[in-house]
Amino acid sequence: MSLNFLDFEQPIAELEAKIDSLTAVSRQDEKLDINIDEEVHRLREKSVELTRKIFADLGAWQIAQLARHLQRPYTLDYVRLAFDEFDELAGDRAYADDKAIVGGIARLDGRPVMIIGHQKGRETKEKIRRNFGMPAPEGYRKALRLMQMAERFKMPIITFIDTPGAYPGVGAEERGQSEAIARNLREMSRLGVPVVCTVIGEGGSGGALAIGVGDKVNMLQYSTYSVISPEGCASILWKSADKAPLAAEAMGIIAPRLKELKLIDSIIPEPLGGAHRNPEAMAASLKAQLLADLADLDVLSTEDLKNRRYQRLMSYGYA
């Protein structure tokens, strides 16, 4: 699959296009007098150096674009790459099965765990089927049902957050969107099993928080976490979505700032160029972090887990 380059990556895209052209010429005529292999190698090294230079100085808006990258790995990609024996569970047992939230039982290094995560789509039909990763109340109620099942069977819960926000449609509001989110916040704070949450892309508002109350909260290096999108913030404060880059900087949506504020525990490094450049390497790093987090939490009693989670929540907002 060819890479899609973002606006700020255009210098890299131009180099990669040259590399592709030279490679194509080399394949067509192996009897050329010039040594194309050496030139391709030189350009590849230059591309890596340029990528390092650009990614060493990314702004919040550029990171927001990376968090939304169409080729970025989604929940089911990480399930496939980092877990074994995944069995998906469906439905909230009340209304419907929301495809914007996926969940089920899997094994992490042989250990049974419950996985719950937002799921976006890549092609148009899949995007519509997944509602662009924006869950309705039935999605959050499905998530809660799976969490309660995990607690009953003493399984750790692992959540993956990647949503622009909860779906704001009339039907979702009529079916109790705010109640479903609020109930999840309350019930997650009371769970008697370890809960590890990881923001893998967009962490949008209450739609993210509804599966984001945990004992450990991680973010991938180029993910974001915020109460509103930069475009939404800009529309409110400056009456123009064009001010989104300014809003992104002001909001503090990136992982280093959130770790500084003690809202997250760990930042998981991404491969050079972002998780979509090497999903396998990203999944390996994510798996290692999850195993380390569970090892830390396994030594705690049920009461210790609940007390620590309570203290964590109560500390938010204090310097």
UniProtKB/Swiss-Prot annotation:
InterPro entries per the UniProt record, alphabetical: Acetyl_CoA_COase_a_su (IPR001095), ClpP/crotonase-like_dom_sf (IPR029045), COA_CT_C (IPR011763)
Signal sequence segment: none
EC number, as in UniProt: 2.1.3.15
Annotated function: Component of the acetyl coenzyme A carboxylase (ACC) complex. First, biotin carboxylase catalyzes the carboxylation of biotin on its carrier protein (BCCP) and then the CO(2) group is transferred by the carboxyltransferase to acetyl-CoA to form malonyl-CoA.
Catalytic activity annotation: N(6)-carboxybiotinyl-L-lysyl-[protein] + acetyl-CoA = N(6)-biotinyl-L-lysyl-[protein] + malonyl-CoA
Keywords of this entry: ATP-binding, Cytoplasm, Fatty acid biosynthesis, Fatty acid metabolism, Lipid biosynthesis, Lipid metabolism, Nucleotide-binding, Transferase
This protein's name: Acetyl-coenzyme A carboxylase carboxyl transferase subunit alpha
Biological source species: Shigella boydii serotype 18 (strain CDC 3083-94 / BS512)
BP terms from Gene Ontology: fatty acid biosynthetic process; malonyl-CoA biosynthetic process
